[in-house]
Amino acid sequence: RSFPLETRLSNPQIKKLIEGGLSAPQTVTPITDPLSEAELECLLSIPLARSRPSVAVYLSGPWLQPSQNQALMLVDTGAENTVLPQNWLVRDYPRIPAAVLGAGGVSRNRYNWLQGPLTLALKPEGPFITIPKILVDTFDKWQILGRDVLSRLQASISIPEEVRPPMVGVLDAPPSHIGLEHLPVPPEVPQFPLN
């Protein structure tokens, strides 16, 4: 007997124990045709440093300063939107005040929405994407490449693994020491029923 999916998700008796936890059956969509080598070369891979993951970005748009056609931006997968500093833009750009909820709470009067197209690319030859609106930092502190651009570029992020030598600890204490030697010796009194 089969149940509809809504019943299976709400009835705990029908859920199955999968890999140590209760979970509903998962639907997996099979890949019918694998990507060709030409399509794999078109996918964008961003190599990043572990300490400060930043990437060069090529910008164009009607509201940018003429000197700001290339910039180094911080890649932040936790940021929903891309953020540009205000000094990269002309003074009379179309702005809408925005309240941004971050780790430190809601920040008001600091960010504006730039309503206007902005074209971005990670290579001079493309692929180019156009973003309809972008956050502007009025304190000129942040230039962040957010998830909106990364998802439109269909970029994958590769962070190199740090190779560490294996740590080998040398035990120089005699086997009778267990690390409690600094405590006082317990009293020798009969403790019923422990002895």
Swiss-Prot record:
Its EC number is 3.4.23.-. One of its GO terms (biological process) is proteolysis. The active site is at residue 76. Pfam families: RVP (PF00077). InterPro entries: Peptidase_A2_cat (IPR001995), Peptidase_aspartic_dom_sf (IPR021109), Retropepsins (IPR018061). Gene3D superfamilies: Acid Proteases. One of its GO terms (molecular function) is aspartic-type endopeptidase activity. It comes from the Viruses. Keywords: Aspartyl protease, Hydrolase, Protease. The keyword Ion transport does not apply. The keyword Amino-acid biosynthesis does not apply. Residues 71-149 form the Peptidase A2 domain. This is Protease. It comes from Bovine leukemia virus (isolate Japanese BLV-1).
